[in-house]
Structure formats: structure tokens, C-alpha cells
């Protein structure tokens, strides 16, 4: 039986690969997509997500979500993903539109209609998920678990300690981590290992139309990294759903720093139990890289 999932995303180049896997992995049933401001503005992430759904002819409803963090000023990653978030490929024009309600309400409505609890997957800032949990707490029993790409037990990627998706809205992440729902965190500890090799990247244009499109996106903004390999951060959250055997997880207490002058957005991961608090997150700490690479090749070969 396919696993029903809702995907909250901020495409973004590596989001495009994760979305492809969510659509084409035969084990998954992607039923709803929502967008959030993150890599670029929410207007741009929504446009990019609709372009991808049209590219794959995927009839999946999409709702536009939060334009700004819960409390603080927005930040983006346009320096990595470009001003549009997904330039480099000539997508065909379309007339698709998002649903007419905010993302967190679309998630609420879909959860309440679902015949069984649904797995939420969040690969951008956690603003929409925090709004859902704070404004619609009656939804919690209908959430099977939340799988996120975000955080780190060690180094950060936008500050010395903080990973971008958490740092973009620390208050939202703190709300989510305190919520009591089951959480699996695929942070930089594993995503920095999730590298597609230059040899494999070179084969993408001949793989299928998806490979050609992804290669164009990668080449446009990450041409230098193409020679050393590309990290597939967001894809790890999808990979865990399908191949949890590739990941080493440890239950830990995790809190989000929201006050520190130098540490705001840091996920404080108590690996050794120093704080004596009960674990609230299953933290991915290691990855079978070869197995991951093989799985990626298999799922992208289906993405035609």
C-alpha cells in the first residue's frame, strides 16, 4: 500500500529533485503540496511548484502558504538558488493556480478528510506547520508523523551553528519541536553526505526529460559544484520515507535556540542525554551513501 503524504516545500533547485521523488516513487502517494517562503519569496516558490507539477502532468492540489516568518523579518537563499529560485530551464507556460485558501488550512482540511493519519513532509522553513499546529491543534491525531529536512546536530550552513530552514523561522521550528507529534529530522549531519557524483550528474541529460531539466537547473546555478558533486539536502526527507534502512537515527531531545545573538536558529540536539529531558525527535545521524545514490538513480529513472 502506498504511503499518503503531504509535502510542504520552497522550490528551490534541490526541492525539484525531492518533488520528483515524491511524485514518482511507487511507494508514495503525494496527495497535497503546499509552499512557503524560504529559498525565495512564497510567490516565486508557488510559481516554481506549479511549473514542476505542470512539467510532470501531476494533478496534485497546491496551496500557497506563509509569506513571512511568524515573528522576524524574512531571509532567503537567492544567492544559492538564484533570484527566481529555479531558472535555467525553459518551462512551458500553463494556467494552473493554487487553491484559494492558505496552506495551513488546506493541510487541516485534507487531514480531516483523510481515511487514515497522513505523513507530513516539510523541506522548507516550518512556518506553515507551526501555523497548523498552533491554530488547528485538533489536527494532531490525524498526523502520522512529520519528516523534515532541517537542523543539525553539529555545524550549520547559514551561521556557524544554524541550518537555513530552521534559521529562517526559529520560532516556528521551536513551536513544531514542542508540539508532541512524532518528528524525524534529516539535518545536515546526513544531507551533507547525500552527494550525487559528477559521473552520475553527467548522465542526467540522456536519462529522460526530468534528467535533462534537472541538469539544466544544476548547471545554471551550481556549475562549479557539478565538478565535485551536488548535495541533495531536501531529497533525504523523501528517501527516509522509502528507504529508512539507509539512515541511522537516534531519539534525542531537540530544542531550537530563538534568543542567542550568535546561535539563533540552532537546533540543540542532546545526543548524550545531558539535559535529562525525554526525546522528542528522531535525529538522522548517518547515511548509507552508496545505497542512497543507487536509490536516487532508480527513482529518477522513473520520472518521465
From Swiss-Prot:
GO function term, MF aspect, one: uridine nucleosidase activity
InterPro entries assigned: I/U_nuclsd_hydro_CS, Inosine/uridine_hydrolase_dom, IUNH, Nucleosid_hydro_RihC_nonspecif, Ribo_hydro-like
EC number: 3.2.-.-
Keyword NAD attributed: no
Catalytic residues, chain numbering: 233
Transit peptide found in the keyword field: no
One CC-aspect GO term: cytosol
Entry superkingdom: Bacteria
Pfam families, per the entry: IU_nuc_hydro (PF01156)
Principal EC category: hydrolase
Example GO biological process: purine nucleoside catabolic process
Entry-linked SUPFAM superfamilies: Nucleoside hydrolase
The entry's keywords: Glycosidase, Hydrolase
UniProt similarity note: Belongs to the IUNH family. RihC subfamily.
Cited function: Hydrolyzes both purine and pyrimidine ribonucleosides with a broad-substrate specificity.
NCBIfam families: PRK10768.1 (NF008036)
Protein name from the UniProt record: Non-specific ribonucleoside hydrolase RihC
Native source organism of the sequence: Escherichia coli O9:H4 (strain HS)
Gene designation per UniProt: rihC
Amino acid at each position: 500500500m502506498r504511503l499518503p503524504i503531504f509535502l510542504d516545500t520552497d522550490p528551490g533547485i534541490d526541492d525539484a529533485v525531492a518533488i520528483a521523488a515524491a511524485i514518482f516513487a511507487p511507494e508514495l502517494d503525494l496527495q497535497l503540496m503546499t509552499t512557503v517562503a524560504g529559498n525565495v519569496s512564497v510567490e516565486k516558490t508557488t510559481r516554481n511548484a506549479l511549473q514542476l507539477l505542470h512539467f510532470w502532468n501531476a494533478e496534485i492540489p497546491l496551496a500557497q502558504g506563509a509569506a513571512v516568518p511568524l515573528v522576524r523579518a524574512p531571509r532567503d537563499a537567492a544567492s544559492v538558488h538564484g533570484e527566481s529560485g529555479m531558472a535555467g530551464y525553459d518551462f512551458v507556460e500553463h494556467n494552473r493556480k493554487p487553491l484559494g485558501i492558505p496552506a495551513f488550512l488546506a493541510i487541516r482540511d485534507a487531514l480531516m478528510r483523510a481515511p487514515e493519519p497522513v505523513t507530513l513532509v516539510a523541506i522548507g522553513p516550518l512556518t506553515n506547520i507551526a501555523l497548523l499546529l498552533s491554530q488547528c491543534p485538533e489536527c494532531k491525531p490525524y498526523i502520522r508523523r512529520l519528516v523534515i529536512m532541517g537542523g543539525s546536530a553539529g555545524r550549520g550552513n547559514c551561521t556557524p551553528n544554524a541550518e537555513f530552514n530552521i534559521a529562517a523561522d526559529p520560532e516556528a521550528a521551536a513551536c513544531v519541536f514542542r508540539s508532541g507529534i512524532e518528528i524525524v529530522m534529516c539535518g545536515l549531519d546526513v544531507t551533507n553526505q547525500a552527494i550525487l557524483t559528477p559521473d552520475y550528474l553527467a548522465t542526467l541529460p540522456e536519462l529522460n526529460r526530468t534528467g535533462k531539466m534537472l541538469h539544466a537547473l544544476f548547471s545554471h546555478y551550481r556549475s562549479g559544484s557539478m565538478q565535485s558533486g551536488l548535495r541533495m539536502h531536501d531529497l533525504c526527507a523523501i528517501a527516509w520515507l522509502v528507504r529508512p534502512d539507509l539512515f541511522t537515527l537516534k531519539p534525542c531531545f531537540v530544542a531550537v535556540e530563538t534568543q542567542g545573538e550568535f546561535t539563533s536558529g540552532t537546533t540543540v540536539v542532546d545526543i548524550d542525554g545531558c539535559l535529562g529531558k525525554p526525546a522528542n525527535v528522531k535525529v538522522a545521524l548517518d547515511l548509507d551513501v552508496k545505497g542512497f545514490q543507487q536509490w536516487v538513480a532508480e527513482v529518477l529513472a522513473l520520472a518521465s
